[in-house]
Every structure is written in structure tokens, then in C-alpha cells.
Amino acid sequence: MKYLINKIKAITALTLVLATVGCDLELQDRFVFKPDVSLEDPYKDITAWQFLSSSQVNNQFNEDGTLIGDNYDYMSAAIAAAGLIDEYNTPNDGRTFLMLNNNAFLGNGDVIALVTGSPDIEEGETPEEVMARADLDVLRLILRYHIISTYITQNDPLVEFGVNYTFQTLIPGEEGLIVLRRDDRLRVDVNRSPAPLPSTATGGGNNERIRNYNYVFSNGIGHSLNDPVRNQPYPSPNI
């Protein structure tokens, strides 16, 4: 019993000492984490058109003099030539823009071939000059198919991975349907089999995986593609 009383006294004394010492310590400044990288969306205050036509993604070249493949020189020239600037510039926060980078215009089966009948461009020919010889009806059809009338991120409304989600583009009716599906790593495929679409959409290399994601604009959201996609074959150009 005496041992227990002495132990209690010792604990009490130690507590008083610690309390006294603790009172002499200054309060530490509250730690606030400041990330090195900004977590804000850098394009949230500009429209899709303002981004696509900006110097940030135009008039930049590789060492061999070719346009940087991930930029949008041809896309901005195509939008202007087709008279569709308003579709990319009008306030509307409920759209998804599938942005076709320079790579999507160059090569067999890509946009330049689809709208001019040939993938060839002359030496020194600018994107504006190429689009000046395009079939504008075909060009408008391609661009409208790459605007979806729903705001789509990698997981909203693509909530479940491995599930096909069907959306409507600016082309009305069945021919304007487009299908997106994500995997468990948040990679998103467009019109990839077994999407519930005609084989003209899912086969023959006409499906595509999104390259870069989630460009948040004041009038929607954008994702970039390395190749164009389709539902039905685009008409042959009348050149």
C-alpha cells in the first residue's frame, strides 16, 4: 500500500513538472503545405477557341522544321476555314471538345486526306493554305463529330470502367453517336470495339485512345486525339 502511494506521488510530481515545462514552450507556427505545381486549371478562364488559336499551341516547330505534332495549327486553321469559330467560342459549359492535334491531320486516312482527297501538302504550304483547298462540307462534318454535347471527364460520367457510354455529337441522329469507355487506369477509348456502333466506327483503325485529358475551358472541356474518329465514313471530298 505504501509502495502504491509513493508511486502515485511520483506520477503526480512528474505531471506537474511536465506541465510547467510545457507552459514555457512557444506555440509552433501552423504548417501550410504549398505545392510546387499549381493545381488550378490554367485555361479555365478562356474558351476552347482561345486556347486552340493561341500562340502557346501554334507556330512552334521541331528541329527539322515540321510543326510540333501535339499542337493545333491545323485544327485552328480548319475551324476558321469551316466557319465554326462560334462552336468553340460561345459560352457553353456542357460540351466536350475532342481536339485534333497536328498529327491527326497528317498521313493517310487523316483529316487533310479526308477533306482534300490526298495527304500531300506542298513544301512551305501553311495550314491556312491547306484548308483553303478543302471540301468545307466534309470538314464541317468532321469537326462537328468531334464536339460532344455532354461534359465528360475521365470518370464522370464514365463512372464504371469497362462500360460503354454513348453520347451525342453535334451531328444529329444515329450517325452522330459516339462511344467512350475507360479502363481501370482512367485511359479512355473512343469508338473502340465492342462499342455498340457500326463496324465503320469501330473497325479499320477508326477508333482511337485519347492522348491528353482534361483541358478545362470556360465553355467546356477538351481532350486531344492523334487521329480523327467517325461513326459513318465521311463523304469523299468534292474537289
Task: Show the residue positions of the predicted features.
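Mature, structured domains of secreted/extracytosolic soluble proteins
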Residues: 23-239
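Bacterial N-terminal signal peptides that target proteins for export
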Residues: 1-12
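C-terminal motif of bacterial Sec signal peptides marking the signal peptidase cleavage site
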Residues: 18-22
